[in-house]
């Protein structure tokens, strides 16, 4: 089976606010397993333990540096909430990915549907049209 973006170097990112480390480790292991199943080239990984209420997260910053530096052209996460539950933070992260021609891939949800439900899909469609950018999915 051919998966989209298999030709792009992939960054795997996980985040959990659960106090048990095993939850975070299991989430990353699931991403690694899924990346292998889809035959993605993993350029790197990062994790954050704690809330997604801020952009000031070491693992998130590592991922963004990798994208900005061209090391990764796609980011694999379990679902959109692993980036943040806050729509304003989600928009900043997705705009960053869009500005750097990178895409976000979710393993356990339909990203476009999640964005639609959160009322964010139209923003990125409009932004892509106005700025001549690709969609970040």
Predicted features and spans:
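Short, structured surface patches at the beginning of a domain
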Residues: 1-137
